[in-house]
Amino acid sequence: RNSWYHNTIKDFIAQGEIGELAIIRVCHMTPGLAPGEGHEYEGPAFHDCGMHYVDIARWYAQSEFKTWNAQAVRMWNYKDPWWLQCHGTFENGVVFDITQGHVYGQLAQTQTHNSYVDIIGTKGIARMTHDFKTAIVELHGVTQTHRLIQPYGGKNIDTLCKLFAESIETGRRSEALPEFRDAALASEYAWRFLRDAREHDLPAIGELETLRQIRERRRTMKDGYGLLRKHA
């Protein structure tokens, strides 16, 4: 929520440049943490990582989830799904789809990823892509067209700490800060979407041997996605 690109897009929406907000599309697929590396204590990937995108979709919609349908895959025959896509509606009629998985070319010679936010209105669009170093925001409104390129900014923990400190000093919570309720709802709905996926066909594709190869490769990688650093 503290990212410059999300706030730029939200401001553009507030200006009426895309008309009425209609569709929110969020995707985050990387060859990141593999099963067994460090997710289990927080659940499958869609909860540990995907809950952030559940939150950002709800933040854009400014409404609560109403309906949903989820499809997942048990990649490499692992016990839990490591890729999930959910689509549905919010109470205000806005439609969403969220795609998340750390299954994106784990054994590719040169790894890559696919991450974006795509906001579609009745008149225009706003979208963002990034490569974890640089973020590109493209705004196509009824009176404005912009292409903004700035440093990605990571998780912006420094901004979060700054807002929190200012809230303590002033005795008033910054409206830019999420509430505990927001975190609880993001977690709750990530679990709900996972449970919904388990009620549908949940195919297992691939073999555990491939997962073993992935873990071994990641264990020896010097530069990769979401590598766990071991300190002596």
What is the predicted function of each stretch?
Residues 189-200:
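Short arginine-rich
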Residues 4, 48, 155, 178-181:
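Residue-level signal for the nucleotide or nucleotide-sugar donor/cofactor binding architecture
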Residues 48, 52-136, 151, 158-173, ...:
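Contiguous beta-strand/loop segments that form the cofactor/metal-binding neighborhood of enzyme cores
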Residues 145-149, 167-185:
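Glycine- and charged-residue-rich phosphate/anionic-cofactor binding loop of Rossmann-like
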Residues 40-44:
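Short glycine-enriched, charge-decorated loop/helix-capping segments at active-site entrances
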